């Protein structure tokens, strides 16, 4: 089974809740999973030939939460090319604001730039439609786990 790092960017804790639910699902499927809240580039690089799941909310005018900005900046500046990396993104946001789910899409664009292979589509979770984000994220994680298993 796969080694999966879940990297979280959260402001109010919803992204962490989604990440913990994803961790449970993936562990139940036999994967080795670790959640990182204030991740460093070093912890990310441990997975550069493995699989990562980025779970992040959006804050301000479409920015990433402070907890994941240092990782994003370090990846952009020093992450290098990572063609062996497989990943997924769960983006949380509120559709009543401009730049809905932009934080997750920023991270997705960066991972595309560094050559990583996305498994499946980015999941956009709208707080307006889904005040309990795990209702939509858990089925997505199950389907994403199928893609991970197929690798």
Swiss-Prot record:
PANTHER family reported in the protein's UniProt record: NADPH OXIDOREDUCTASE A (PTHR19384:SF128), NITRIC OXIDE SYNTHASE-RELATED (PTHR19384)
InterPro entries (UniProt xref): Flavdoxin-like, Flavodoxin/NO_synth, Flavoprotein-like_sf
UniProt entry tagged with the keyword Flavoprotein: yes
Protein name, UniProt field: Flavodoxin YqcA
Keywords carried by this UniProt record: Electron transport, Flavoprotein, FMN, Nucleotide-binding, Transport
Cofactor notes: Binds 1 FMN non-covalently.
GO terms under cellular component: cytosol
One Gene Ontology MF term: FMN binding
Pfam families linked to this entry: Flavodoxin_1
Subunit structure: Monomer.
PROSITE patterns: FLAVODOXIN_LIKE
Physiological role: Probable electron transporter.
Residues reported to bind FMN: 10-15, 99-101
Residue ranges of every copy of the Flavodoxin-like domain listed in the record: 4-145
Cofactor: FMN
Similarity-based family: Belongs to the flavodoxin family. MioC subfamily.
